[in-house]
Curated annotation (Swiss-Prot):
The chain crosses the membrane at residues 1-21, 22-42, 57-77. Signal peptide: none annotated. It is a multi-pass membrane protein. This is NADH-ubiquinone oxidoreductase chain 4L.
Length: 89
């Protein structure tokens, strides 16, 4: 439980502190999502419920698809602008 909280807080801090780099923001979102998945997995193992484990596998698959789509959008963004940095005005 404490490990998942620490991982989630690391993800939030990474997202907040790296507001100019889209890749690091995407990685931070993935860390937060995997922390929640790990919490669901550990909780389902503690109560001996297979439904939580299958739900964790489902979350991991969706996170992989999300990462692939996000990186594809980033490649298109890089080709268009030449950089993946966000410029605030």
């Amino acid at each position: 439980m404490n490990l998942t909280l620490i991982l989630f807080l690391i993800g939030i801090l990474g997202f907040v502190l790296n507001r100019k780099n889209i890749i690091l923001m995407l990685i931070s979102i993935e860390i937060m999502l995997l922390a929640i998945t790990f919490l669901i997995l550990v909780s389902s193992l503690n109560i001996d419920d297979i439904l939580g484990q299958t739900y964790a596998i489902y979350i991991i698959v969706v996170a992989g698809a999300e990462s692939a789509i996000g990186l594809g959008i980033l490649v298109a963004f890089y080709r268009l602008r030449g950089s993946v940095a966000i410029e605030y005005k």
